[in-house]
Regions:
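Conserved GNAT acetyl-CoA-binding A-motif
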Residues: 103, 132-145
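Conserved acetyl-CoA-binding loop-helix of GNAT-fold acetyltransferases
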Residues: 111, 117-131, 159
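Hydrophobic alpha-helical core bundles mediating ligand binding, dimerization, or RNAP-core interactions
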Residues: 30, 34-37, 64-65, 125
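Conserved active-site alpha-helix within GNAT-family acetyltransferase domains
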Residues: 122-123, 138, 146-166
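Actinobacteria-biased recognition of intrinsically disordered, low-complexity terminal regions
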Residues: 87, 174-177
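Conserved beta-strand-loop-alpha-helix junction that forms the acyl-donor binding cleft
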Residues: 112-116, 142-154, 172
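A conserved beta-strand-loop-helix scaffold within acyl/acetyltransferase catalytic domains
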Residues: 41-103, 107-113
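Acyl-donor-binding surface of acyltransferase catalytic domains
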Residues: 1-28, 168-173
Length: 177
């Protein structure tokens, strides 16, 4: 796993702390993480796609965590925490197999709209990659995907050393009533 140059490291922010955890979401963050996961379905650039908002609650998070563990995988999460409120305002997740796999998959990254502009996306992704390197040093590649219109996340991925290797198109058809 090639990590970014030291100059690419984001600087700390006085307003936010970064918390990392593996597999199980801390109980105190469950409701907050459910709200963030709901916003993941509506607050990201969707390229004109129409999607239904997802419903997340603490039970769904725990069920998802159990399903991932049962499949022999682990979830690494980094969350941005507002120091003043103690509230989770951003998160990112990585998944990898627990069997020594050399691959990991970057999944969600979300910063609440009202907390953007503090480099939280970069900070949480970097913290999670650091966590991955510590806990799973055998991982050599991280696969991620991104919408072309999400220029902010594409820029973050560039800063972190990701390289485009393929393209995927999504099509949606609207049926008339």
């Amino acid at each position: 796993l090639r990590m970014p140059a030291p100059g690419a490291q984001p600087q700390p922010d006085d307003e936010y702390d970064i918390l990392t955890f593996t597999d199980s979401t801390p109980d105190r963050l469950l409701d907050q993480m459910a709200r963030l996961r709901e916003r993941m379905s509506t607050d990201i650039p969707l390229g004109g796609m129409n999607v239904e908002p997802e419903v997340w609650d603490t039970e769904r998070i725990r069920a998802m965590e159990a399903k991932v563990a049962a499949a022999g995988r682990t979830i690494l999460t980094a969350a941005g925490i507002n120091r003043a409120s103690g509230e989770a305002v951003a998160y990112t997740t990585l998944e990898t197999a627990t069997d020594g796999s050399a691959f990991a998959f970057q999944s969600d990254t979300l910063v609440r709209r009202e907390d953007r502009g503090h480099r939280l996306g970069l900070r949480i992704k970097q913290a999670n990659l650091d966590q991955l390197a510590r806990e799973f040093p055998q991982v050599e590649r991280v696969h991620t995907w991104n919408a072309e219109e999400n220029s902010w996340m594409l820029h973050i991925n560039d800063q972190l050393g990701f390289e485009a290797t393929s393209r995927l198109a999504r099509w949606q058809r609207q049926f008339r009533d």
